Every structure is written in structure tokens, then in C-alpha cells.
Amino acid sequence: MIFQKKKNEKIEDLKIEKKNLIIGIGRLTKQKNFLLLIRAFKKILIKYPNYHLILLGEGEQKKMLEEEAKKLAIQNKIFFLGYQNNVYKYLLNADCFVLTSLWEDPGFVILEAALCNTLIISSDCPNGPNEILSSGKNGFLFKNNDVTDFLKEFDKFKNSTNDELKKKRFLAKKQVKMFTQFAHHKSLESIIELN
């Protein structure tokens, strides 16, 4: 789990420009609701055609999600990369991390994204995300299982200034440091070496 913060550690195996990346991480299951993300991503591409979506994880819905991407004719914009030992190089190169879960335990992956200074857009699902994120302050929360509200929050993200996004990232990282439930990890900051 130890990594050095290297923004320059590129995702060389992908034949895409290393910007305009959205990342989703988790088991490809109903709970994680990646179907919502894929359907929303189709609409994102209408406004922001240079984006790509990276999904990290395995699960019983993988084939169905790949078929949905083909049905929507966006399969060339989505990379299903399976389980990855090192998610950090993806988080460090992403514009934003999106969590679309229908329900969630306090999300460890949200903490990882915040410590990588990756902007977070998350469903306001039961447990977890709203214990860490305050919408508009240190990230963006959208109504659970609501594509329209997700797209609204994504537009807020895109319309934010660099200074506003920098402040949100800083406050998210600060909140993670105060998040006592994960104190038994001896502070993620000491495990995940960041500048």
C-alpha cells in the first residue's frame, strides 16, 4: 500500500491522453451501482467529449457493464482494467473520483482519493460518504441513484475555478486526517507517503 506521490507516474498502458479522466473503483456489483456511472458518462460525453472513464475492480456485473457500454456506443471511452494492486497511479492522474454506491460502509477509497488530492463526487448514500464529504465544501454529493443530480454536481465540478477546486481538495484531505474511525490505520498519511 505504500506509494510515492508521483503525478508523473503515467498510465502508459492506456492509449489515451492523461487528462480528462474520471475514475471509479470498487467491486463491479449492484451495490456499487456502476451502471448509473456508465449511463451518466454517456451524457457527460455530449458536453465533454474528451473524457475517458476508468473502472478498477472485478465482479459479477462486469460483462453486463461492458455490454451496456457497447449498447451506448461508448466502449472506446471506457477502460475496464480489473483489480489493480496500485490504484494510486490512477487516482493521481484522474480529474475526479466518482463513487456511485447505493449504500456504503465508510468508504476507504474516498480516503485514498482525498489523500491523492483527487476531487471526489459521491452519491449521498447511507453510511460513509456524508461522514467525510460536505457537498460543495470538500467535494460534491449527489442524490443517491439519481443520474440527473449526478450530472448537476459534475457540471458544478467542471464550472469550478482552479482555486475553488484546490480548496475543496485541501479541505477533503484535512477532513480525512480528522476522520478518527480510521485512526487504527496509524494515520493514512504515514502509510501513504504524500508531499
Per-region residue spans from a language model:
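A short, well-ordered alpha-helix in the C-terminal region of glycosyltransferases
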Residues: 163-178
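Short hydrophobic beta-strand element within catalytic cores of glycosyltransferases
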Residues: 119-123
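C-terminal alpha-helical cap of glycosyltransferases
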Residues: 181-195
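Conserved acidic donor-binding segment of nucleotide-sugar-dependent glycosyltransferases
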Residues: 134-136, 140-147, 155-162
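Nucleotide-activated donor-binding/catalytic signature segment of Leloir-type glycosyltransferases, i.e.
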Residues: 66-82
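A conserved mid-protein helix/loop that constitutes part of the nucleotide-sugar donor-binding site
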Residues: 20-46, 53-56, 60-66, 108
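Acidic anion/phosphate-binding donor-loop and adjacent secondary structure
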Residues: 1-14
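Aromatic "clamp/platform" in nucleotide-sugar-dependent glycosyltransferases that forms part
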Residues: 83, 102
